[in-house]
């Protein structure tokens, strides 16, 4: 899929909900799994348009594949991209606040 043809729904795959990310939400930081072809500008535009918030900054990192085994078959998990989105003061994503 070409980078220009990604819609906002293609960019944000799912929110990452862990104990650490729940604590980061108090600091206005939200963590998403994003498309591997996306960049900081695309993630910022997608979050701002889908959740009606203002984004202060976006940090992106690639998560390396981990080795996995299923019996005698060996393989690796897929690599994926993680985005930490920091919102401007006074903004929260209400859709994700109730998630446990």
Curated annotation (Swiss-Prot):
InterPro entries, sorted: Nucleotide-bd_a/b_plait_sf, Ribosomal_uL23-like, Ribosomal_uL23/eL15/eS24_sf, Ribosomal_uL23_CS
Keyword RNA-binding in annotation: yes
NCBIfam families: PRK05738.2-4
One MF term in the entry's GO annotations: structural constituent of ribosome
Family indicated by similarity: Belongs to the universal ribosomal protein uL23 family.
Plastid is among the record's keywords: no
Function: One of the early assembly proteins it binds 23S rRNA. One of the proteins that surrounds the polypeptide exit tunnel on the outside of the ribosome. Forms the main docking site for trigger factor binding to the ribosome.
BP term (GO), one: translation
Transmembrane segments: none
Gene name per UniProt: rplW
GO cellular-component term (any): ribonucleoprotein complex
Disulfide bonds: none
Assembly information from the UniProt record: Part of the 50S ribosomal subunit. Contacts protein L29, and trigger factor when it is bound to the ribosome.
Superkingdom per UniProt: Bacteria
Keywords: Ribonucleoprotein, Ribosomal protein, RNA-binding, rRNA-binding
Protein name (record): Large ribosomal subunit protein uL23
